[in-house]
Amino acid sequence: MPKMKSKKSLAKRVIAKKNGTLKRGKAYRSHRATGKTTKQKRHLEKATIVHVTDMKRIKGLLQK
């Protein structure tokens, strides 16, 4: 049977950490940012952890 392939589009957006959690970037930052406050844009720059309810599904797509 052939090897399972990971979803490359997701693999480029998510980074696995040593403790098993996944780190991702936040949405709503790439364009149309003039209507957002400086504080909103600053907080959207920071990465966040993938929520526990999504973790199993995403790890299945990444084959990890």
From Swiss-Prot:
Keywords: Ribonucleoprotein, Ribosomal protein
Region annotation (Disordered) ranges: 1-43
GO-annotated biological processes: translation
Entry GO CC: cytosolic large ribosomal subunit
GO molecular function, one term: structural constituent of ribosome
Stored InterPro entries: Ribosomal_bL35, Ribosomal_bL35-like, Ribosomal_bL35_CS, Ribosomal_bL35_sf
The family this protein is said to belong to: Belongs to the bacterial ribosomal protein bL35 family.
Family matches, as NCBIfam families: rpmI_bact
HAMAP family named among the record's database cross-references: Ribosomal_bL35 (MF_00514)
Name assigned to this protein: Large ribosomal subunit protein bL35
Organism of provenance: Mesoplasma florum (strain ATCC 33453 / NBRC 100688 / NCTC 11704 / L1) (Acholeplasma florum)
